[in-house]
Regions:
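Divalent metal-coordination and catalytic microenvironments
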Residues: 9, 46, 121
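N-terminal catalytic cores of NTP/NDP-binding nucleotidyl/phosphoryl-transfer enzymes
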Residues: 24-80
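Short, hinge-like loop/turn segments at secondary-structure boundaries
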Residues: 83-88, 138-141
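Short, internal active-site loops enriched in acidic
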Residues: 125-130
C-alpha cells in the first residue's frame, strides 16, 4: 500500500524528490500520523491549501491519520504577506471564529470521525497560550543565539 501511495503522489507531481525514498516507503508500511499547518489569518482557506488537503486525504484513504495543525497563535500575530508594513494584529475572538470556519472547510475534505484514521485537529494556541514571555525566554533564550540570525552586512 505504501509503495502504491508514493507512486500515485509521484505520478500526480506531488513528490519531486525525497531524501530517502526507501526509508519513506518503510515508514509508510505501517500507519503513521502526519500533519500540515494552516494559519488562520482569514476566515477561509485559499486555493493554495487545496493541494496539501488532497494529499492529506490520500494519506487518510491509505490508512494514515492526518493532523491538520491550525496556527491559532500564529493567527494572533497576523498575516506576514505585507512585507513593507506592520502586521495587523488579530483579535483572539476573531481568530477563534476563523479556526472554527476553517475546521468546517477541512471537514468537507478529510474525515474527523473516531476511526483509526480519523483526523485530529490541533491548534498551536492550545500549548503556546499558557507559556509566559518569561518562561519562553528562560527556556528558549538560553539556547538560541540572536547574533546568528542578524545580517552580517549592516547596510540598509
Amino acid at each position: 500500500m505504501s509503495k502504491a501511495l508514493l507512486e500515485d503522489l509521484k505520478w500526480r507531481g506531488l513528490i519531486a524528490q525525497s531524501t530517502d525514498a526507501k526509508e519513506l516507503e518503510t515508514a509508510l508500511s505501517k500507519p503513521i500520523s502526519l500533519y500540515v499547518g494552516f494559519d488562520p489569518t482569514a476566515p477561509s482557506l485559499h486555493l493554495g491549501n487545496l493541494v496539501v488537503l488532497l494529499v492529506l486525504r490520500r494519506f487518510q484513504l491509505a490508512g494514515h491519520r492526518p493532523i491538520p495543525l491550525v496556527g491559532g497563535a500564529t493567527g494572533l500575530v497576523g498575516d506576514p504577506s505585507g512585507k513593507n508594513e506592520e502586521r495587523t494584529l488579530n483579535d483572539e475572538k476573531v481568530v477563534t471564529d476563523w479556526v472554527a470556519k476553517i475546521k468546517k472547510q477541512l471537514e468537507k475534505v478529510i474525515d474527523f470521525s473516531d476511526k483509526k484514521t480519523g483526523a485530529i485537529m490541533a491548534n498551536n494556541l492550545d500549548w503556546t497560550k499558557p507559556v509566559s514571555a518569561l518562561e519562553f525566554l528562560r527556556d528558549i533564550g538560553t539556547v538560541s543565539y540572536t547574533h546568528l540570525t542578524l545580517p552580517t552586512n549592516r547596510e540598509v
